Amino acid sequence: MKDRHGLLSAPIGRVLLNMSLPNLIGIMTILGFSLADTFFISQLGTEALAAISFTFPVTLIISSIAIGVGAGVSTNLGRLIGSGNAPQAKVFLHDALLLTFILIASLSALGSIFIEPLFSLLGANETSLPLIHDYMMYWYVGAPLLVLLMVGNQGLRSTGDTRSPAMIMTLAAIINLILDPLLIFGIGPFPRLEIQGAAIATLFSWLVALSLSGYLLIIKHRMLERAAFDIDRMRANWSKLAHIAQPAALMNLINPLANAVIMAMLAHIDHSAVAAFGAGTRLESVLLIVVMALSSSLMPFIAQNLGAGQPQRAKQALLLSLKFILVFQTLLYIPLAFFAQPLASLFSTDPQVLEWLSFYILVLPCAYGPLGIVIIFATALNAYHRPMSSLVINLCRLVLLMLPLAALGSYIDGVKGLLLALPITNLLMGIACYYLAQRICEPVKATTADTL
């Protein structure tokens, strides 16, 4: 595995730009994938849309595991590739994918057995449960395919190839977009399967995408090969994987839980504020898309350079990324500040919702630059093999700062006080993370690939 994409030698800014642009397309595709499913299912009525909403906690848990395992694969493979240890990288990826399949297949089997008890516990009624069953039976079949796809794509990204995963996910989204209306509504020769059709369309798109990802990993790039059964080796590789994956998965679960607490606080003050906050968080996912694309590119870049014994280059990339995202998000805020009210009117016509959403757009994005610094630094810590530090930073932001400040703000000035607490939290944590980033260094015990 040569340095095909220049991660170890080409100009840092150019490499990160070349890696981030395809990542940007990939993330936009995933957002579009979700929106298309939601749109077509919403045409079936409120009950179908409610049924899909009930599946969110389960899909979130599976996705969080996939993101955690993907972070572990990207970090460990990046170091092995950077150190020139291609044979060990191939074996590590084999063992990581094997563990991923065993874990997700087991969880999916259990989930399919306990669909009714689990979703009844989540509050689904007798009308929603049959719809949830129809959807989740196929979703559980496809869950191992989805997670293998996500982890396999991270394997490709660890080499610096972000274009192939983006193309794969774009193709999957196109297939899903074509099949959704055909199978949901029974257009032409296709049967009308309604909510079940949405699940089948998604399953088929994942299968095609996984086939392409497997072709690239196994045949084109020769990144994966069958390894002999050796329980000691597998246990050692799984331990390295879990060291990154467990905190990363947990970190991904904390954010929606904290948002749920904020929404509960808002519900006690004004239900219109809940609607505004929900719309605001959806807008936030779009406004932070460049942050997500850059952080996804930075992790393999840092990992490869640390594996190659180039810690200074890794640190330069980190600091350059932090400065860029601060400037970019600050410039992005300027038009938002001027057009907060017209933008809010796209989401609602209710006067009270408009007032709160306009205020949200005016105050929260002003600190998306510091928030971007927090996100990128926390991601970089995984590449530095400091996943617990990454988790602690997020816990500090959400539990020690955001929630207490939000409670205090709501007590002092209701909805406005609560919302103002969020950018203040992001500003304080952004300053702290930039300070820490300037002092980061490679841990002694992780300076070589043999001691990952």
UniProtKB/Swiss-Prot annotation:
One of its GO terms (cellular component) is plasma membrane. It holds the Pfam family MatE. InterPro entries: MATE_fam, MdtK-like, Membrane_Transporter-Flippase. Keywords: Cell inner membrane, Cell membrane, Membrane, Transmembrane, Transmembrane helix, Transport. The keyword Nucleus does not apply. It is found in: Cell inner membrane. It is a multi-pass membrane protein. The chain crosses the membrane at residues 21-41, 49-69, 96-116, 131-151, 167-187, 199-219, 248-270, 283-303, 324-344, 357-377, 392-412, 417-437. GO terms for molecular function: antiporter activity; xenobiotic transmembrane transporter activity. Disruption phenotype: Deletion of the gene results in a severe decrease in flavin export. Mutants lacking the gene have no defect in reduction of soluble Fe(III), but they are deficient in the rate of insoluble Fe(III) oxide reduction. Belongs to the multi antimicrobial extrusion (MATE) (TC 2.A.66.1) family. Flavin adenine dinucleotide (FAD) transporter that facilitates export of flavin electron shuttles. PANTHER family: MULTIDRUG RESISTANCE PROTEIN YPNP-RELATED. This is FAD transporter. It comes from Shewanella oneidensis (strain ATCC 700550 / JCM 31522 / CIP 106686 / LMG 19005 / NCIMB 14063 / MR-1). The lineage of its organism: Bacteria, Pseudomonadati, Pseudomonadota, Gammaproteobacteria, Alteromonadales.
